[in-house]
């Protein structure tokens, strides 16, 4: 590719300037990559913590639910569940983390359905299961938000790494090769010009010497 570059001093100056600029851009991208990795480690740690908490809470919900099934019967519980229309809603928005758009998700607590049963007439395990599930909802939503955030950060990290790879593998070699090519041609021309000048000086010197005899 270097051979397609016009070997002039102006191009040499421009290519050197562009090489310095590209080096600065690469350094900025590397800094961005480090910051993204730092955010990813932080959010991954939070995700693991919340995931474990949700896992424990859902175990409690399931245990209470199984005990409620044993007391009330699966058909009665299914009938109560089917009597409820889907009503849960979440409020979502976008926030920016180091130039990366990530979602924020919040549960609209007013849309949580009321108990479709009476605490007096049904098993206390059913009420316990409902309360535990209601408490777990916020953490489940938080888990979803963290997962979406991590995916967005990973996507941006991959884009950044691809740009760095492109600079390392294609752009920098092109500019360095072009600069080397131009320098070599200019140096060769300079040597040729120097040789011509020496020859001309010798010729002139001989003429002067011949004229003085």
UniProtKB/Swiss-Prot annotation:
Taxonomic superkingdom: Archaea
Membrane topology: Peripheral membrane protein
UniProt keywords, alphabetically: ATP synthesis, Cell membrane, Hydrogen ion transport, Ion transport, Membrane, Transport
Protein name: A-type ATP synthase subunit D
Main location: membrane
Function in brief: Component of the A-type ATP synthase that produces ATP from ADP in the presence of a proton gradient across the membrane.
Assembly description: Has multiple subunits with at least A(3), B(3), C, D, E, F, H, I and proteolipid K(x).
Name of one Pfam family that matches: ATP-synt_D
Any single GO BP term: proton motive force-driven plasma membrane ATP synthesis
Lineage: Archaea, Thermoproteota, Thermoprotei, Sulfolobales, Sulfolobaceae
PANTHER family listed in its UniProt record: V-TYPE ATP SYNTHASE SUBUNIT D
GO molecular function: ATP binding; proton-transporting ATP synthase activity, rotational mechanism; proton-transporting ATPase activity, rotational mechanism
Family that this chain belongs to: Belongs to the V-ATPase D subunit family.
GO cellular component: plasma membrane; proton-transporting V-type ATPase complex
């Amino acid at each position: 590719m270097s051979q397609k570059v016009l070997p002039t001093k102006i191009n040499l100056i421009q290519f050197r300037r562009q090489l310095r600029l590209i080096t600065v851009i690469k350094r900025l991208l590397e800094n961005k990559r480090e910051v993204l990795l730092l955010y990813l480690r932080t959010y991954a740690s939070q995700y693991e913590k919340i995931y474990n908490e949700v896992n424990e809470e859902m175990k409690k919900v399931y245990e209470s639910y199984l005990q409620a099934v044993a007391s009330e019967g699966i058909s009665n519980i299914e009938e109560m569940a089917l009597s409820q229309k889907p009503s849960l809603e979440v409020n979502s928005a976008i926030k920016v983390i180091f130039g990366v758009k990530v979602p924020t998700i919040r549960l609209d607590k007013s849309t949580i359905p009321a108990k479709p049963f009476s605490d007096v007439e049904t098993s206390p395990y059913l009420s316990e299961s409902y309360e535990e599930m209601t408490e777990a909802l916020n953490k489940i939503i938080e888990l979803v938000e963290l997962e979406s955030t991590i995916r967005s950060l990973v996507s941006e990290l991959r884009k950044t790494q691809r740009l760095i790879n492109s600079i390392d593998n294609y752009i920098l070699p092109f500019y360095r090769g072009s600069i080397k090519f131009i320098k070599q041609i200019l140096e060769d021309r300079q040597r040729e010009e120097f040789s011509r000048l020496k020859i001309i000086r010798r010729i002139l010197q001989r003429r002067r010497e011949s004229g003085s005899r």
